[in-house]
């Protein structure tokens, strides 16, 4: 992400004017978390106009527009973020020239033209999101291939989601006769070669630190041997010079949940300790463990968590990005104060993306939860109850 300028709004306390140029899908997700309904956007859009009555001659102009946001449409996998809004008055006179106020327009973000966000409410969480988006070390540095016989999934693991880049599926023949064995071996070779080709196409080996190959049985080990074999045959230096980034892990399935199994497995913690998402999985796993044990060290729900924070008892505060993107600005500010309170008492605050299975799970538990430093029973009872 390129932050071209960020100015606090002198007329609107708590507001800001930010000019950005997103560079990848992670940046789109950052913008999605920052822009709220009723914020204003200034952007450039191409308009095609007819010059004659026959409509044969046309001109395409790049027009500067300003809209107030009504709604958004976001798809992480397809790198798609679109805002719908209505044109508003631009006091500077630079935008909406020859475009009437009140006209409904849409704006799809791209990686070519910078755009400006005029926010009514810009808080420290949004500032943190921008800082992280500009930090290349914080970007996705982990890929994973999870497989079993005849099926494989090539994925990127980011702080905001597990992105399926390509699914490879082959129908494997049954080995009843000698000819079937030969067919099986041929199909197996094609299967592994297809995975290798998908990895070359969809993964940027220059930016990755870790590539997880995981499977039940020995499929992951065979895949790694095949990857290095094919790389030797092609003299693929990007792979041959980075053999150390590959590691093999065991999981129970060749589907996406197999990646989650690996990320939360303590056996692989040392190899994954530098990845942000691995930390989130381990904390969420600990929360669910305490919840299942019913040992009064894990609570969810706003009332219970706020009460635990008042005691200074929170070790980890867990929030979804959805609650921090709430239309209720006052409630959003209360959650930010809660994060400050927890951190000032030595705890840590984690924000989980609802595009990940972790965030989805927390969202089903009210979107706010905590792990305590010590057990606190009866947090769910009213203060006046005996």
From Swiss-Prot:
SMART domains (UniProt xref): eRF1_1
Keyword set, alphabetical order: Cell cycle, Cell division, Cytoplasm, Meiosis, Metal-binding, Mitosis, Protein biosynthesis, Translation regulation
Cellular component GO terms held in the UniProt record: cytoplasm; Dom34-Hbs1 complex
Cellular location(s): Cytoplasm
Cofactor: a divalent metal cation
Consequence recorded when altering residue 27 to A: Reduced No-Go Decay (NGD) pathway
Pfam family, any one: eRF1_3
GO BP annotations listed: cell division; meiotic cell cycle; nonfunctional rRNA decay; nuclear-transcribed mRNA catabolic process, no-go decay; nuclear-transcribed mRNA catabolic process, non-stop decay; positive regulation of translation; positive regulation of translational initiation; rescue of stalled ribosome
Gene3D superfamilies for the chain: 3.30.1330.30, eRF1 domain 2, Pelota, domain A
Chief location category: cytoplasm
General function of this protein: Component of the Dom34-Hbs1 complex, a complex that recognizes stalled ribosomes and triggers the No-Go Decay (NGD) pathway. In the Dom34-Hbs1 complex, DOM34 recognizes ribosomes stalled at the 3' end of an mRNA and engages stalled ribosomes by destabilizing mRNA in the mRNA channel. Following ribosome-binding, the Dom34-Hbs1 complex promotes the disassembly of stalled ribosomes, followed by degradation of damaged mRNAs as part of the NGD pathway. The Dom34-Hbs1 complex is also involved in non-functional rRNA decay.
Subunit-level organization: Monomer. Component of the Dom34-Hbs1 complex, also named Pelota-HBS1L complex, composed of DOM34 and HBS1.
Miscellaneous comment in the UniProt entry for this protein: Present with 1720 molecules/cell in log phase SD medium.
Protein family according to the UniProt entry: Belongs to the eukaryotic release factor 1 family. Pelota subfamily.
NCBIfam families: pelota
Protein name: Protein DOM34
């Amino acid at each position: 992400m390129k932050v071209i300028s960020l100015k606090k709004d002198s007329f609107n306390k708590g507001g800001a004017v930010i000019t950005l140029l997103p560079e990848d899908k992670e940046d789109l997700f950052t913008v999605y978390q920052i822009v709220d309904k009723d914020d204003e956007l200034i952007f450039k859009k191409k308009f095609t106009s007819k010059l004659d009555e026959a409509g044969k001659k046309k001109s395409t102009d790049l027009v500067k527009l300003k809209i107030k946001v009504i709604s958004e449409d976001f798809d992480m996998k397809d790198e798609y973020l679109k805002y719908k809004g209505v044109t508003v008055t631009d006091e500077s006179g630079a935008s909406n020239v020859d475009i009437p106020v009140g006209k409904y327009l849409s704006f799809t973000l791209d990686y070519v033209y910078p755009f400006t966000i005029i926010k009514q409410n810009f808080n420290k969480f949004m500032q943190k999101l921008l800082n992280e988006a500009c930090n290349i070390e914080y970007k996705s540095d982990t890929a994973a291939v999870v497989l079993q016989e005849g099926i494989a999934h090539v994925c990127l693991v980011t702080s905001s989601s597990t992105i399926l880049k390509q699914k490879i599926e082959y129908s494997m023949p049954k080995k009843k006769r000698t000819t079937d064995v030969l067919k099986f071996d041929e199909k197996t070779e094609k299967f592994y070669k297809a995975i290798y080709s998908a990895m070359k196409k969809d993964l940027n080996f220059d930016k990755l630190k870790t590539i997880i190959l995981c499977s039940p049985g020995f499929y992951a080990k065979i895949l790694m041997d095949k990857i290095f074999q094919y790389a030797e045959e092609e003299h693929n230096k990007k792979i041959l010079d980075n053999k150390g980034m590959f590691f093999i892990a065991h999981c129970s399935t060749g589907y996406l949940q197999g990646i989650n199994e690996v990320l939360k497995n303590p056996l692989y913690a040392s190899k994954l300790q530098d990845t942000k998402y691995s930390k989130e999985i381990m904390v969420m796993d600990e929360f669910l463990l305490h919840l299942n044990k019913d040992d009064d060290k894990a609570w969810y729900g706003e009332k219970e968590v706020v009460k635990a924070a008042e005691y200074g008892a929170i070790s980890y505060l867990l929030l979804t990005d959805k609650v921090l993107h709430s239309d209720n600005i006052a409630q959003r500010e209360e959650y930010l104060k809660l994060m400050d309170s927890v951190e000032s008492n030595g705890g840590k605050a984690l924000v989980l993306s609802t595009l990940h299975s972790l965030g989805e799970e927390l969202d089903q538990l009210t979107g706010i939860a905590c792990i305590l430093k010590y057990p606190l029973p009866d947090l769910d009872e009213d203060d006046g109850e005996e």
